[in-house]
Structures are given as C-alpha cells and as structure tokens.
C-alpha cells in the first residue's frame, strides 16, 4: 500500500457562514461513524434507508441503523479486527453495505471497496494490494468468481457473505449479526477512543482499464468536509425522499449519501433498470446523478417522442420549449 496517493484534506466552513450554523454539530465530529448516535437521537423513527430492488428489500429507521452499526462493529471486534486493519468490501448498494461500511469505521478499520462486476483478477489484486485481513462479499457468486479461494481462506481473519444463505465456511449475515448481538448484551465496550480526523476511512480503486488499479485513500476529514459543505448545493429537510442509483463505492455517491443521511433524509436504493419506475414510485426531491444518466433519459424520451402522433409531438415540443428551470434561492 506504499504507493497510494492521498487526497488532500479541505478547509471547513467559516463559522459565520449561513450554512455553518446548521452543520455545527457535524463540524465537531472527527470520524464519519460518529454521526449515527447523533442522528439516532435527532431523527429516531424516521426511515433512513429503504432498499427497493435488493434481494432482501430491507428498510431501517435511524435508530435501527445506529444500533445495527454498533452491533456489527462489535462483531468485527470479535473476529479480531483492530484499528488500521483493511477489509475489502465487494458489493453494490444495500443497507447491509452501509452497515458494514460504518461498522468498520467505528473500529477505526479501513475498507477497500469495489463493485461486483469487476474482473476477478482486479478484485484479487485489490485484496492483496490493500493488505486486507478480511473480506466481505455481496453473495456467494462473488466469492465463487475469485480464483485464489484456498489462499484467502488461510490468510484472512474472516470472509462474510452479506446474504442470508449458508455456504461453505463463509459467515452469513444473520450469523454475523447474531455475534454482534451477543457481544452487545455482554456490554462489550470499545477501547478508549483514539480516533483522529486524519485516519484513513476507505481506499477507492480505479478501474484498472489502463493497467493495474490504483488505490486512493480517503480520510475521515475528506468525507466530513463533503458532509458539511454539500449544504451549499442542497439543503434538504428531514424526511426528504432521496433516490440513490449511482454505485455507492464511487466517492461521489458515497459522499452524497453520507450528506443526505446527516440531514435526516430517507434514501431509497434503486438501480438503472428500475429507475424510471422508482422515480414515479418515490417522487424524489433530490438525487445525486451524473450527466450520462440524464443524457440516457433524454435520448430515451426523444426516441419515444418520435413514435407518437404528430399532433402530440408538436404539443410536447411546445411545452418543452416554453418550460423554465426551477432554481433554489
């Protein structure tokens, strides 16, 4: 991991800034994971996350999410994880991804993240390059695509399957949660807080299309800066519906999600296949997106428009031409 390129930290909002007063509590944290107890007290029964299209279709309130993060962090501790350890997390968006991510941070551990569609050689490189001591996979299918399974079984402290299914020696999600619940009942506490804002929180890897993937460590300071300063762009109220479609293992989507959670929003997970249906279902007030997504929607709209009767085409084109952009003051 010696060749990692660190992203510089950024300055906090000035204290006299109009957004700073709303973010003053967040501004005092030195670790991303510390926001959850604060959010639990502030937003409690408000739904934090709702997985619309995942296999388990789970949803959790802020209280439930905070409690699960604590239990999961105790599970990681039980399996021998300590501050500074790296765990590779290979999964797409889901509440379980988020819980594992924040449970790792609670211990001061670091996650190296990637999506499930990456080639096996790339995933194995990330596990090795990051010096990971543990592995979390979305499903047994992700585990089965890896070539060095026997070597990983011997070397890693644990291999966790985020699904309920039992498979080989993988620790399934219910079993992992059960360990945390037992540790929680023992009043098992964490060691003295030695967290620091410059601790590495996560390692993001490039796609590797032009060579080996390159790892970029992001610190808690990097993420906290986004959580505080994204208020310049969006200022949602608690309970606001947010539709999340971009991969959570990308820095942009991840920072945006942390920010929306910090505002008490309700985030709905979808995927590109169901985006059209879920926009109608959720009626989101805000989304974190990229131009390519809207270009695809734009092209799809005009393709459908061409198939409509001429009179309807003219009417819709008139409405588009005379529409205006809404801008927030």
Give, region by region, the residue ranges found by the protein language model:
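Conserved ATP-dependent adenylate/AMP-binding module captured primarily in the ANL superfamily
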Residues: 116-148, 226-243, 273-286
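Conserved AMP-binding/adenylation subdomain of ANL enzymes
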Residues: 224-241, 248-329
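Conserved AMP-binding A3 loop
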Residues: 59-63, 201-227
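AMP-dependent adenylate-forming
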Residues: 8-18, 35-60
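ANL superfamily adenylate-forming
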Residues: 54, 143-197, 301-329
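Conserved AMP-binding/adenylate-forming core of the ANL superfamily
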Residues: 48-102, 119-124, 177, 220
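Structural core segment of the AMP-binding/adenylate-forming
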Residues: 1-3, 106-179
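Conserved pre-ATP/AMP-binding loop-to-beta segment of ANL
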Residues: 47, 181-205, 212, 235-241
């Amino acid at each position: 991991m010696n060749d990692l390129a660190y992203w510089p930290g950024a300055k906090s909002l000035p204290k006299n800034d109009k957004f700073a007063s709303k973010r003053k509590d967040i501004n005092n944290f030195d670790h991303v994971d510390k926001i959850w107890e604060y959010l639990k007290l502030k937003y409690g029964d408000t739904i934090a996350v709702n997985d619309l299209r995942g296999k388990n279709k789970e949803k959790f309130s802020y209280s439930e999410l905070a409690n699960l993060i604590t239990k999961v962090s105790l599970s990681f501790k039980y399996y021998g994880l300590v501050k500074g350890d790296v765990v590779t997390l290979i999964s797409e968006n889901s509440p379980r991804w988020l819980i594992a991510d924040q449970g790792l941070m609670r211990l001061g551990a670091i996650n190296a993240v990637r999506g499930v569609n990456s080639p096996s050689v790339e995933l194995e490189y990330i596990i090795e390059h990051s010096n990971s001591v543990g592995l979390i996979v979305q499903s047994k299918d992700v585990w089965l695509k890896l070539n060095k399974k026997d070597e990983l079984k011997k070397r890693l402290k644990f291999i966790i399957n985020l699904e309920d299914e039992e498979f080989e020696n993988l620790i399934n999600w219910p079993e992992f949660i059960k360990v945390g619940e037992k540790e929680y009942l023992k009043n098992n506490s964490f060691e003295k807080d030695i967290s620091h804002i410059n601790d590495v929180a996560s390692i993001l890897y490039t796609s590797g299309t032009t060579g080996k993937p390159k790892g970029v460590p992001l610190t808690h300071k990097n993420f906290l800066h986004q959580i505080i300063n994204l208020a310049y762009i969006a200022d949602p109220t608690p309970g606001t519906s947010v539709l999340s479609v971009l991969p959570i293992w990308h820095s942009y989507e991840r920072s945006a999600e942390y920010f929306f959670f910090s505002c008490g929003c309700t985030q709905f997970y979808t995927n590109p296949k169901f985006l059209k249906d879920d926009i109608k279902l959720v009626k989101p007030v805000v989304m974190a997106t990229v131009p390519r997504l809207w270009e695809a929607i734009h092209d799809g709209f005009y393709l459908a428009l061409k198939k409509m009767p001429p009179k309807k085409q003219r009417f819709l084109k008139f409405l588009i031409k005379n529409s205006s952009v809404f801008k927030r003051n």
